[in-house]
């Protein structure tokens, strides 16, 4: 079908052709147009105008403050949207990076009250002020820097309070020591010879299971002793040698005189009772004196450590921990002289006072030591990525060439706390002299080989003399992480509350403390009078 319109528009002629599918031709004067082309052109421009209208409306809603009345301006504004990016997309990050990279001092933030305190405050202020990229970056930097400063201060305060809590003697323990010392002076039953005269030969009899506990904490020692004897299948074969210092000897003797653990044999001795320690110069005492002098000069005290604003909080925590009295305690170094302290014994199990024994330990004597001296649990393998990820590089400073050329940073570390020592094999080595040689080297280097603890020199001294034992015998970390599973801890032979959260402190983890507290007798008159809680 064709449609013809006369030039004068007086008549229209319809000619039947090939139907509607043919082109419709319009004649106006001498011109001829395709009606289909006109139709599709109008349709295209209709959609284009609608699209432009929608984009310009969205731009207005987004809050673009710049007016745009010309088509050229509108084109500039719509071009980035059509292309899917802004024209200055490369400049915005660049401007932000420049602002963020500029250092911001603490003084610039001091006394400022206009810095947003929360993310919600920050977003509200940015929307209200309609900030550009630089202003946005500046406000963001100020807020994050302020939060970092506050977080750092809070962390350091936490570490300082934990240091004070873990290093100080709780008044309950002080009370217990005083009451027992008084009891020792007025009550003959608190001054018994330990052990009784007829049991003294068993102290050097290698047919018995000999355990050594060095502690100046009466409450902790009582829990270790009670848990050891209660869980032993043959308690009559147990001999526990308790070593303490001069000031704690009388209270410790009073406690175990009034709280016997028969049929086990308990010996309580002070360091000054050992002839070996009272004759001539003792390396451990000399090393401790030097160590104390160097630490006092090197550290400067907790106030100096905390006042350092440039130090990482984790480093601050490590330095505070190094100030702990236990690292300069003779009780902590005494294990290196076990062969001299017990010259008649061939094998002993050395126990720390922050452990709890949950099973019979006599099978430890059946472990084949393969000629090695120290039976210990390794601490580089296990599900706990914090406690069981320790290698030599975790304790020793391998940036020091002396350490780097002598040891392998990837070598697996092991733990103190519950160790089987073959004293007969030990006496054939130079372990003790090696220990003191490296202690002296560390002091000469201003503690640059390692910074705290007796384990680092122990790792060096016992290097090549360690027999790995099953992790079942010694579970660590109960004083470090609250995430430790109670069920896992309950199934271990020995649980070790190494770390600051000792079970006798208020900062102990509540769900783990019952493992230790169940060996306290809440009805005991000394425990009750000093308000020592079992839970």
From Swiss-Prot:
Pfam families per UniProt: Glyco_transf_8
Keywords: Cell wall biogenesis/degradation, Glycoprotein, Glycosyltransferase, Golgi apparatus, Membrane, Signal-anchor, Transferase, Transmembrane, Transmembrane helix
Keyword Plastid: no
Lumenal side of membrane: 59-535
Record-listed E.C. numbers: 2.4.1.-
SUPFAM superfamilies for the chain: Nucleotide-diphospho-sugar transferases
GO CC annotations on file: Golgi apparatus; Golgi membrane
Cytoplasmic side: 1-37
InterPro entries assigned: GAUT, Glyco_trans_8, Nucleotide-diphossugar_trans
Pathway: Glycan metabolism; pectin biosynthesis
GO BP annotation list: cell wall organization; glucuronoxylan biosynthetic process; glucuronoxylan metabolic process; pectin biosynthetic process; xylan biosynthetic process
Highest taxon listed in the record's lineage: Eukaryota
Tissues of expression: Highly expressed in stems. Detected in roots, inflorescences, siliques, and leaves. Expressed in cells undergoing secondary wall thickening, including interfascicular fibers and primary and secondary xylem.
Reported phenotype of the disruption mutant: Severe dwarfing and seedling lethality. Collapsed xylem vessels. Reduced glucuronoxylan and homogalacturonan content in cell wall.
Enzyme class (EC, first level): transferase
Subcellular location: Golgi apparatus membrane
PANTHER family named in the record: GALACTURONOSYLTRANSFERASE 12-RELATED, GALACTURONOSYLTRANSFERASE 4-RELATED
Protein name per its UniProtKB record: Probable galacturonosyltransferase 12
Annotated source species: Arabidopsis thaliana (Mouse-ear cress)
